[in-house]
């Protein structure tokens, strides 16, 4: 495809003639240093710099042309630099056209919401694969499909990477694609050019208010996924969530299903029996009723399971097949993940990604019934992010845990002590508490001092295998640290309790 054809497909008019318009486009690049002969450079605005300003470097590296926003202010007529007013959406259109509209060649299912995206998408992938449909999964942990798996750098990739990955999944024979859709991605139009067969909304609670103006702005970003620009099929909405209820009011009744524990939900569960290794109960759906036997712990995971079943039903999966497949779901790395050295281990250690007030509360409430002794919560909050949630999380940990260990998460460029102070502002002074800014030492201390029967819940980082200190990313894995601490505990039995 030459540049003129690609621009036409993306509804972009260059406004001038140039020999480059007849050249073949061999690749799309959003970074000037990645450009090569035959590239089309798409200069995106950044938080610190205007990416379009790097068009001279892109052309010097061999790019045949550049597409930029008016903020880049290229000199007219000097080179093949095309200015578009809607650079984010133009990027989505260009990427979709260049990769031959992959979302038209597989059924794309998206999940948005503050919490539950990763678990729900993994569940849907598992159900589809078990029924026999090759499926791509794109999300917080990785992008994977048959024969391919790579660690993800963003919950939702930028438009060029996203369309490239979907095209590769189509080439690999995938019938379905399941992806997490973040509020950042929706606000930045990263998924522009994608058409979703099914879109699910899990919940909305406080998070990312360092990026969004307020909760309403955050909700407006999430709600974009359920407009005609993106969704061509059915919406799956959490009927127990007030923002899910608001979305339902914006859609025709025949365009959505609800899920939850309320009796009027289309997909609902009842007679639930929560265990340390999962939950059983009855599930009722428009497809009929069945027995729920899930290996996932906690009420919040019942909601994730119901969302996944509803999404599967929306693309034609039989209820019985989904319930059977659910029984052997392997779980998700860093989500309620138990760390155990041997079956006789005398304390429970759980690592989880909970990093919002709501997810921390759900985690501690889910763990409490299965901890016979004290519940010890180790957590911190990320730096250069929403400060207002820090005292809230401190208050939640103090209310629901028997002992709180406050530590660092990813301080980034913020003063770590200020982050700790923000958290401590929400913790009553009478709380049993340890403050240890070194996360490794905090985990070690919590595990070494736990008594038999206690539970140590390490929250915030989950699957992450790094810590961001300043601008440097260093290796750090809560699960590794927990295992090391458990080994140390075996050497020092007298320190227990």
From Swiss-Prot:
UniProt xrefs under InterPro entries: Folylpolyglutamate_synth_CS, Mur-like_cat_sf, Mur_ligase_C, Mur_ligase_C_dom_sf, Mur_ligase_cen, Mur_ligase_N, MurE/MurF_N, UDP-N-AcMur-Glu-dNH2Pim_ligase
Enzyme Commission number, as recorded: 6.3.2.13
A GO biological process held by the record: cell division
Annotated residues for binding of ATP: 113-119
Cofactor section: Mg(2+)
Biological or metabolic pathway of the protein: Cell wall biogenesis; peptidoglycan biosynthesis
Reactions catalysed according to its record: UDP-N-acetyl-alpha-D-muramoyl-L-alanyl-D-glutamate + meso-2,6-diaminopimelate + ATP = UDP-N-acetyl-alpha-D-muramoyl-L-alanyl-gamma-D-glutamyl-meso-2,6-diaminopimelate + ADP + phosphate + H(+)
Extent of motif Meso-diaminopimelate recognition motif: 409-412
GO (cellular component) term, any one: cytoplasm
Main location: cytoplasm
Protein name listed in UniProt: UDP-N-acetylmuramoyl-L-alanyl-D-glutamate--2,6-diaminopimelate ligase
Organism this protein belongs to: Thermosynechococcus vestitus (strain NIES-2133 / IAM M-273 / BP-1)
